[in-house]
Amino acid sequence: MLIVGLGNPGSAYASTRHNIGFMVIDELVRRTSATPISKSSFEGELFKSKDNYLLKPMTFMNLSGSSIIAVKNFYKIDKVLVIHDDLDLPFGALRFKFAGGHGGHNGLKSTDEAISKEYARVRMGIGKPTHKGEVSSFVLAPFFENEKQHLDKWISTAADAIEKLQTMSFDDVSSQYSIKQI
């Protein structure tokens, strides 16, 4: 399986809401002592962990699909799981979904265009900004102080769920690990 965490490259974005996917990949890499794979044509940081590949596209969010399709095609991977931030869920929510629309998320839009909509998703709720016109600044901002105290546990729970996908069905993992909010 190819497990992708969406985010933006660079230290300026490292602790932002939009980079929650990267944070989960970092946790999975840490837990599994995954081996880095170097290949510039993948346009991302790629790791091998047992039977899985872990990817952080380094293309910026709106071009994530090019990195995903490069890895998917090179290794002939059928199953893809994408971890991403979701404005439509309250902070701390964790939901699992197969296929569906991109909901205005540019990383998902790019992924859909590259590999189709037929992939599994881990939706991580980041809440909504107060005003609709503030979406871009909201997703590119760090988490609030009161959210930061829950971040490690939330990321750990998402990583636990993803690890369980090796031995449990997607529906069973969804039932066991879905969180409405923290």
Which residue stretches match the model-derived regions?
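Short glycine/threonine-rich catalytic loop with a Thr-x-Gly-x-Asp
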Residues: 101
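Hydrophobic alpha-helical segments within soluble ligand-binding/sensing domains
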Residues: 104-107
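Gly/charged, well-structured mid-domain segments that form the phosphate/adenylate-handling core
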Residues: 126
